[in-house]
């Protein structure tokens, strides 16, 4: 019988080792390696989880695959940049952002960044 209660999302990467290092060491998430499966599980502080899997000929997602809600986007961007993460990834014609990559108009304050596979992630102020 189908039960949607435990649903979670997933996305592909081209290098599981690089993804493991980035999500565990750079972002500080708890990352579980699913033995022999070629899958990682990202454990989020909210109790949620995300499946990450290796895919040959991976093409980065052209949309945001994972959003991290934060109380203060400015502080989150400072923290990410101190960890070596680039937050200015879009041309202003696509999404008008300031020099630090924060979009300040048309919705919540948000800054996008990429994982080592090129997938788009974001911090957004709630």
Placement of each model-derived feature along the sequence:
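A short, glycine- and basic residue-enriched loop/turn
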Residues: 10, 37-39, 110
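Short amphipathic alpha-helices within nucleic acid-binding modules
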Residues: 22, 74-79
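Short Gly/charged-rich anion-binding patches and loops
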Residues: 18-19, 37, 75
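Conserved short beta-strand elements that form part of the metal-binding/catalytic scaffold
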Residues: 30-64, 70-71, 88, 106, ...
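N-terminal beta-strand motif that seeds the catalytic metal site of vicinal oxygen chelate
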Residues: 1-20, 63-66, 124-126
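Vicinal oxygen chelate
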Residues: 1-2, 68, 77-126
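Amphipathic alpha-helical segments
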Residues: 17-30
